[in-house]
Each structure stands twice: as C-alpha cells, then as structure tokens.
Amino acid sequence: MYKTVRSRFKVLITVIIIVLSLIAIKKLIVDPQPVRDIKMNTVYICGFWNRYPVRTQSRYYIEFKKDGTYVLMHDDSRRHQENYGEDGDGSRPEIEMFFGSYEIKNGNYVLTLTERTGVEFKDVKAVKNKKINFFYRNKYKNGGNMEAMVFLTRKGNYLFGYPDDTGKSYDERARYYWLFNKSDINKFPSSPEEFRKQFKMDKKAEQERLAEQNR
C-alpha cells in the first residue's frame, strides 16, 4: 500500500511539472512578449498601458527602418459602434498614419514627423466595407514635432509614450503603450497614396459629414 501511494504521488508530481512546463512554454513562446530588442523593418503592435490589445481595442503600430525612417499607425477603427461618440465627443472610427525620421538618444527613439495622413469612417459598418467619408494628408517641410516617442524603460522593454519633465523618461501619468511582438499587421502601406487606395470614398457620407460640420 505504501508503494502504491508513493507511486501515485510521483505520478502527481510529474503531471504538475509537465503542466507548469507547458504553461511556461506558452507564456514564453506562444503568448505576445514585450519588446526588449527593436529589430529594423519589423512591425510592432502597441498595447494600452502594459497590456496586449484585445480585438476591439484601439492600438498603435510602429516600424523602424534601416534608412533612419519610421512608420507609425494609430488604428481606432475596431471598437463597437456604441463605443464611439461617448459623452458627445463626436468620435468616429478612424485610422491615421505618420511618416518621418528617427534618432536614437540614450536608448530612446526620438521621432520627427514629415507626413501625416488619415481616413475617417461614418460608422462600424463602413469600416467593414472600407468606405470612408473623409481623407486628409499633411506634409511638414521642415519636420513636424512628434511629442510622443519610443522609450527604453528601466525594466528593459520599449514603450510608446510622452516624455516627462526631464525629457529622458516617459510620463507615467500620461497614456503610454508597451511594444509587443506578435503583431497582426506584418507590412505597412509603402506610401500615403498606397494607404488611400485601400479605401473607397462614400460620397453621400462625405456630404453628410460636411453638412454636419457646417452647422
């Protein structure tokens, strides 16, 4: 009987070790991980605070290129319809893209803006149909100011956020987004023109937007 109990105990311990090992493997290999080493020409997804974004959350994406340029995307087109226009803020689904150059200072990536473009959708249904009611494109001849930048934290991971008073670290009181691997986007449009070609202009929705804007 003693041998039987001892044998069962060994089996139980083995099972526990296997389960814990599988959980550790999943966390390290399968689950998204915070970015600790930025690789060039790789798109990273940025989750609000320190969490990987769920399907219906707004998020940023960023890619640094070997030629000293970057592409940044803000995708706020994934929320449910009832989550737009909350408290009368007039928000609608939109996607913005930022193009520019970067400089590495003290391990941080300082961003300069050269071009910005974006689209707006009437509602969630329009997002699914890729029909927009507004498109804009702005160029910054002398380089625009990007207040936000990518910081290397004391923990050794990177995040997209706003500088504190020293300018060397991020402001923990402002919004910030951890960079994660496992991005659901692997390639950005190569230019604002290519970005615009992904969508169709909904003329009726555009007229409604202009009429509402002029009231």
Residues of each region from the PLM?
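Lipid interaction determinants
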Residues: Y2-T14, V19-F99, T112-R215
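Mid-length scaffold segments of soluble, non-membrane domains
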Residues: G100-I104, Y109
